[in-house]
Amino acid sequence: MKKLCSLIVVALICIIALSACGKEQTKTYEGDVSGKHVLTSITYKDDKVLKQSTINTIKYDDLGMDKDEAKKLFAKSESIFKDLKGVKYKVDYKDKKAIEHLDYTEVDMKKLNKRLGVSTKENKDISFEKLEKQLKHRGLKEKDKMDDK
C-alpha cells in the first residue's frame, strides 16, 4: 500500500510538471530605449513567440522635436506596417508626447520578418529566449502586467 501511494504521488508530480510545459505564458517588459519609454508584452509557448504588443511613448522635448516632426518620424514606421494583415498600428499625438501602439498578435511572422528585413534561420519562428535576452540587454526590466502608466 505504501508503494502504491508513493507511485501515485510521483505520477501526480509528473503530470503537474508536464502540464506546465507547453502552456501559453505572457511576460511584460518596461524601460527606456533611445529616448522612448517602451512597454512590451510577449505571449509565448515553450520557446516560440506567439504574439507581441508594444506601446512606445516619446516625449517631444527628449528628442528635440515638435509634434509635426514626430509625425514625420512615425510616418516611416507606419509605412512599414501599412497593409500588413494582422498588424494593428496607430499613433496618438498628445501635446507633449506621442504614444505609438503596435500589436502584431495575428500577423504571419514570416511576412512581418520579410517586411522588417529580419531573417530568421530557415524562416523559423522568433525564439522567446533570444528576444528576452535582447530586451534585457537593452535595459528593459520584467514587469507584473502591461499598462501604459
Question: Model features per residue range: what roles?
Answer:
Residues M1-K23:
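Sec-dependent N-terminal signal peptides of Gram-positive bacterial secreted proteins and lipoproteins
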Residues K23-K149:
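Subset-of-secretome marker
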